[in-house]
Amino acid sequence: AIVTIPAGEKSVDFEIISNKKGVVADKVQLEIGVKYPLPEADMGRVEEVLRVVVKPYMEAEDLTEEQQALLEGYKAKGLDLSKWIGVIPVKVSVEVPPTDGLESLINGMKKVYTGKTVITLSEDATAEQPILKMTNNPMGLTEFMYDMLRKETVENDMFWYYDPGEGEINPYMAMMELIGLSKTSLETFEMTLDNIRVDFPNNGVSNVEFLGGRPDIWDETELVTVVPFAYNYSAWNRLKELLDAGDNELAQEYVDYGATLDPTQYLFYSGIDEDYWEDGNWMEPQGVLTGNKLTFQFNFDHYSAGGYSIIRVEYTLSE
């Protein structure tokens, strides 16, 4: 498809929309660039290519007979979770403080994300403890988390692309070359979140617990309390495969230096159950289910962070 920029203009608006035929079975990457010639004296040379990832429609997961029976039992006790099973709309607001360690976040970032999450009943749910699991776009944060991971790694121009000098090696660039990673390579990044514990309601309000422990990156015998997302990142999978094989000394050498792609090394760098940063941004982590709303609030930080980010999540069912 071709979009024409009218004479005398420097920009044009266009939309990429679904034809709703459901023919996309897997993620597809589209590239949007500029076709030359252009009046470079007026517009400069446009080198960037915009890459858009088109994803297939989300689908709800089928429940087993046992899970359906659990839902009926919860409903009898005053907690109707059946309406929260499926593809649920979500709105997320994120406030990231200024980050001196990353050029892309030098002024911080405020952004609102809208999307959908696939929610199902966890395999660990019991009659006494309702537990939900988010299997696709948990908390509506997949796009945000992948963006932050890329900012810390493959898009980190300040620290990952330095000139090592004659006869030396930049381990970050060497690691990327080893696994075929670049700013433009097509990668996949997915998240899930299990063990979302929902209390039976008290005066129509259910408390929702969603935090969990993760090994501290500096001392794996210690746990830090975070939102325990499980990550599946294609570039890290390739690097980890080399590390697990144990026969690639270069891969291990680069990672020992710090050139890793493990999402847990960059996302939720600190615990969020206490105010470790003391920067004025900490808030009590909270999850609440009431009526047609399921809301969460919690903090987040990353490897180069200058303080806590503030995240607020709201799921709202149609009336």
Model-derived features with residue positions:
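Acidic/polar, low-complexity intrinsically disordered N-terminal segments immediately downstream
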Residues: 1-99, 308-319
